[in-house]
């Protein structure tokens, strides 16, 4: 089970992805702007940060920087619509048109396991 923060602006997509993750046993917090990201990071720790495809590129960069600054050790997954990802600093990129619910869930689980292994090793 991973602690996941999903940042985006498309409510339907956020709700769908939250449902997929919660059914698999993950804890999920949704954030729609930087203020909510900072608040969530102060309230708890996250293994995986998901950045939605509907965010403009500059906003994705700000969100990524904020997650890295306020959620130490977080792994970032970027969803994108384009052929080339917007966010070079993400750990993983998923193209929306090529992603199934199962591949999304597998990717989050793999990222969380990397984060958890690193966290345990440093303790």
Where are each of the predicted segments found?
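Two-component/phosphorelay signaling modules centered on CheY-like receiver
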Residues: 10-29
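Acidic, metal-coordinating helix/loop segments flanking the phosphotransfer/catalytic sites
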Residues: 30-48
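Output/docking surface of receiver
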Residues: 77-123
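Short acidic active-site motifs
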Residues: 33-37, 59, 100
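Conserved N-terminal glycine/acidic-rich loop preference
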Residues: 34-35, 46, 54, 85-95
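Conserved phosphotransfer microenvironments
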Residues: 50-73, 80-81
């Amino acid at each position: 089970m991973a602690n996941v923060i999903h940042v985006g602006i498309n409510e339907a997509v956020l709700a769908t992805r939250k449902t997929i993750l919660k059914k698999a046993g993950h804890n999920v917090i949704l954030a729609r702007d930087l203020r909510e990201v900072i608040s969530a990071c102060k309230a708890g720790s996250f293994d995986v940060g998901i950045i939605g495809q509907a965010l403009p590129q500059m906003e994705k960069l700000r969100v990524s920087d904020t997650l890295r600054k306020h959620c130490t050790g977080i792994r970032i997954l970027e969803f994108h619509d384009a052929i080339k990802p917007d966010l070079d600093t993400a750990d993983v990129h998923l193209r929306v048109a090529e992603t199934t619910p199962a591949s999304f869930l597998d990717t989050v689980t793999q990222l969380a396991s990397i984060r958890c292994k690193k966290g345990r090793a440093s303790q």
